């Protein structure tokens, strides 16, 4: 564990350079749910709370929208959650909807509503795959020659949550 590593080789809680590297290596070794009680100390605050801390101390929440494809019902849920918690919304460059302004104590309630609607974390905070971007492909585009949406969704579903030393995005 990270605590055992510190006991043997260091002190403190880990710097911004060593902690993510050690977290990536150890997470790869046991490939388990990273928020288990014994594994949680490895996680940065953003990973632990599934929110990205902003300069004003609030958090942004970024649900996964594989390939940028989302149903009308899920859009309604995002809008209702944003309205109920007074969150600012923005379409990201990664084809997702980012919800800004959540207080730390609101995150469990926000995620409960999102998970109930079928969302999961978009890992916009962790060191893992964030998003696979796609055009609409041959499903809608007259110039499309392949099912790029289907491929993007399959790639994102296959690699979501896989830990790495840095975050990455498939284009």
Q: Language-model features: where?
A:
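Compact, charge-rich alpha-helical regulatory domains located at protein termini
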Residues: 1-12, 16
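Terminal amphipathic helices with adjacent charged low-complexity linkers/tails
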Residues: 13-33
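Long, charged amphipathic helices and adjacent flexible linkers at domain junctions
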Residues: 35-50, 125
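Short glycine-/aliphatic-rich beta-strand segments at the starts of folded cytosolic domains
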Residues: 46-68
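Short amphipathic alpha-helix segments
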Residues: 68-85
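A common structural junction motif
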Residues: 82-87, 114-122
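Helix N-cap motif at beta-to-alpha junctions
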Residues: 102-107
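Conserved small/polar residues in nucleotide/adenosyl-binding loops
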Residues: 169-170
């Amino acid at each position: 564990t990270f605590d055992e590593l510190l006991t043997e080789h260091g002190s403190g809680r880990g710097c911004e350079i060593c902690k993510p590297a050690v977290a990536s290596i150890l997470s790869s070794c046991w490939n388990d749910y990273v928020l288990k009680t014994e594994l949680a100390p490895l996680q940065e605050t953003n990973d632990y709370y599934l929110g990205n801390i902003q300069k004003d101390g609030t958090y942004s929440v970024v649900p996964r929208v594989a390939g940028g494809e989302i149903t009308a019902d899920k859009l309604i849920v995002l809008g209702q959650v944003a309205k109920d918690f007074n969150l600012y919304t923005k379409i990201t460059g990664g084809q997702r909807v980012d919800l800004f302004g959540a207080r730390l104590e609101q995150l469990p309630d926000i995620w409960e509503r999102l998970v109930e609607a079928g969302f999961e974390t978009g890992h916009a905070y962790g060191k893992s795959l964030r998003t696979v971007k796609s055009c609409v492909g041959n499903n809608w585009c007259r110039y499309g020659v392949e099912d790029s949406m289907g491929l993007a969704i399959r790639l994102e579903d296959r690699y979501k949550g896989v830990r790495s030393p840095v975050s990455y995005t498939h284009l």
